[in-house]
């Protein structure tokens, strides 16, 4: 049965509207800011107290790339960061309770090394961490009143306070909250690409672990990429996922009409 036709009347939807501005601050460094309006509706008709949630958030990102000398060749080193979903809380019950947005910090670096005039190889590393505080869990021997006090404190934190506390409140330790992605890419003449990578997430956070392999082909105005994911843990919905992406080069399209 389709979920929309179920007796529970579920009809969820998510919508976001973004406005972004980017600027090159120097020959090697650039930054971008994105402002976002979010509307989220769980779509359940069974609970009359359920309302669509509205929130505002922002992304702040920066990107640096420089050439570094490695032997007789110049390799391109890059570093970037992204603070995403920094904003207000969201409520689905008219403001009685407010939930934290899934703010996230991403740090990434890469090195692209030219083997010769036609062949290049790149290695990349990404680190991700959600900046959402842990909801309090009742401890052994704790009274209901003390537990409720901690819950009330948790709900009263501002979005910024919650983001900062997320770096120190994990019962598993900070390092186990960090998601790690590593990858490598070989390219020939900037037209043919072969890629491979691995994603790791601790079992206490989400337990996503998978390998990925892919290939790409670039022409003057478009690029076609494909990737295949293989999970290393059971019951992963991403297992054996095949993805395709098609991108267009706007400058290349403009040149066709000149």
Positions of PLM-derived features:
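Outer-membrane beta-barrel porins/channels
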Residues: 4-258
